[in-house]
């Protein structure tokens, strides 16, 4: 309950107008039914119809947290299955249409947090300039997660100042493309 409240406070601070919490218990996502969780994410992809999906890498991202690793695994599979006519047929028979988001990115970084589980961060394939002010706003939003307070000092120390870029790894795309460093996650995306 407290983690949900922290998440909602963080979203409110950022001005997010729609957020959903799927109700899985903190630190227990690895015990959830794979097809159920992926199905819930497929449902949201089909309803919201995003062009780009962002998630953690399957190593758990910067923190190496098991829930983050599972979120990455579930989101990766949902990215693949949301566009298929042979997955979650009950959603399609209820009137939803399949939807193939065009790109899937994993959040990544060029540093590691000390005293965390070892991770294998994916190669940076996109550097998005966000500016110091936006990055600082992101950090302040993170600070609404009071239960994560022990990480704050380590994160600040690891950042070594206020970065101005966010880093991502292009994990999948619907259209073949040459490997290159992108500056915009919507580069090459075709509008519906």
Positions of the model-derived regions?
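Metal-dependent de-N-acetylase/amidase catalytic core
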Residues: 31-192
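Active-site rim/loop-helix segments in enzyme catalytic domains that contact anionic ligands
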Residues: 1-48, 84
């Amino acid at each position: 309950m407290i983690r949900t409240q922290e998440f909602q406070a963080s979203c409110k601070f950022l001005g997010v107008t729609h957020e959903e919490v799927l109700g899985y218990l903190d630190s227990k996502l690895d015990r959830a039914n794979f097809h159920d969780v992926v199905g819930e994410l497929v449902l949201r992809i089909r309803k919201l119809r995003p062009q780009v999906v962002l998630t953690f890498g399957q190593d758990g991202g910067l923190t190496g947290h098991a829930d983050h690793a599972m979120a990455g695994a579930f989101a990766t599979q949902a990215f693949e299955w949301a566009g298929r006519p042979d997955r979650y047929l009950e959603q399609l028979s209820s009137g939803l249409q399949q939807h193939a988001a065009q790109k899937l990115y994993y959040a990544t970084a060029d540093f590691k947090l000390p005293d965390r589980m070892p991770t294998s961060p994916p190669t940076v394939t996109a550097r998005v300039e966000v500016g110091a002010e936006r990055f600082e706003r992101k950090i302040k939003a993170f600070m609404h997660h009071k239960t994560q307070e022990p990480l704050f000092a380590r994160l600040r120390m690891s950042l070594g100042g206020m970065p101005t870029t966010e880093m991502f790894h292009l994990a999948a795309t619907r259209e073949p493309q040459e490997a290159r460093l992108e500056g915009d996650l919507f580069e090459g995306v075709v509008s519906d």
